Amino acid sequence: MKIAIYGQYYQNSTEPIIKDIFAFFNSNNVEMVIEENFLNMLYEKQLVKKDYKTFPSNSALDNSFEMLISIGGDGTILRAAAFVRNSGVPLLGINAGRLGFLAKVQKENIDILLQYVINQNYTTSERTLLGLTCEPFNEAFKELNFAMNEVTVSRKDTTSMITVETYLNNEYLNSYWADGLIISTPTGSTGYSLSCGGPILTPDVKSLVITPIAPHNLTARPLVIPDDTEITLRVTGREDQYLVSLDSRISSVQNESVLKIKKTDYKIKMVEIPGETFLKTLRNKLLWGEDKRN
C-alpha cells in the first residue's frame, strides 16, 4: 500500500499526531510518500529522521496511490485537493485544526481509524468542484482553476461596494450591489457561504449556492441552483481591479472581465470512515442538541 502525506503548518499540538501516523504506517509496512516542503519541515523539527520519497509541491499525484492523507484543518484539505485533481486518488483529512468539517478524523481515536485504512474498511464520497475561466485570459487561472469549496469575488482596495452582474445559463439574474458574491458547492456550504447566511447542503445534493456578501439590498437572499448551471459574472466598481478567490487561492482581476463558473467534469473523492458521517459532524461541530430544553 502506498499513501501520500501532506501537511501545511507545524504546531506543537500536531507533533503527537504526526508521530502516531508515521509510527503506525511504518509498523504496518506502508509506503509513505511525503510532500517535499512538508517533509523538509519535519526534518527541521527532527520529528522524522528516516529517508522518505517525496512528491513535488507543484504537480498532481498519479493513480498509484491508495489515498492522500492531509494533516491539518479544512484549509489544508482544500490545498491538498490541488495534488489530487482528476487522478481519482481519495482524500482523508486528519484534524489537527479546530472546526474540521472536512478533516473529520480526530486525534483521540487516530489508531483505530488508521487501522480502517490498512484494512481498506472505508468508502468514498464524491465532491463537486467548480471550474473557472476568465475573459480576457488571466495567467493566475491557467492551471489551478478549480475550487472545492467556493469561488468568491470581492472588493479590493476600497470600502465601496462592487456591482456583480450575474447570469445563469446566459439569462440575466441580478446585479448584486454588495461587498462580494460567493458561488459555493455543497462541500463549501458549511464555510464562507454559511457565515454569510447561506444554507447548509449535504454533500450529495446536486446544487450550488449563490450567496451575496453584505448586500446593500436586504432582499438579495442566497439562492440554490442546479449544479449543471453555468454562471457568468461581470464585476464593476470604483477601483480598477477586484479579487477572485478559489478556496484559499486569491488573484486580482481587471474590472469588466467576464468570469464563467461551472462544475468540472471530474470530482474529488473523500474517504469516509465508518461512524464518521456528515450528519454526525454537523451535530458535533454546530453543537446541535446541546440546549437541554430540546
Curated annotation (Swiss-Prot):
Claim: Transmembrane is one of the keywords in the record: no
Cellular component GO terms, alphabetical: cytoplasm
NADP keyword on record: yes
InterPro entries in alphabetical order: ATP-NAD_kinase_N, ATP-NAD_kinase_PpnK-typ_C, NAD/diacylglycerol_kinase_sf, NADK
Pfam families: NAD_kinase, NAD_kinase_C
Localization per record: Cytoplasm
Catalyzed chemical reaction(s): NAD(+) + ATP = ADP + NADP(+) + H(+)
EC number: 2.7.1.23
Amino-acid positions noted as binding NAD(+) in the UniProt annotation, renumbered to this chain: D74, G75, R79, N149, E150, D179, T190, G191, Y192, S193, L194, S195, A214
A Gene Ontology BP annotation from the UniProt entry: NADP biosynthetic process
HAMAP family referenced in this protein's UniProt entry, alphabetically: NAD_kinase
Function (record text): Involved in the regulation of the intracellular balance of NAD and NADP, and is a key enzyme in the biosynthesis of NADP. Catalyzes specifically the phosphorylation on 2'-hydroxyl of the adenosine moiety of NAD to yield NADP.
Protein name according to UniProt: NAD kinase
Organism expressing this protein natively: Flavobacterium johnsoniae (strain ATCC 17061 / DSM 2064 / JCM 8514 / BCRC 14874 / CCUG 350202 / NBRC 14942 / NCIMB 11054 / UW101)
Gene: nadK
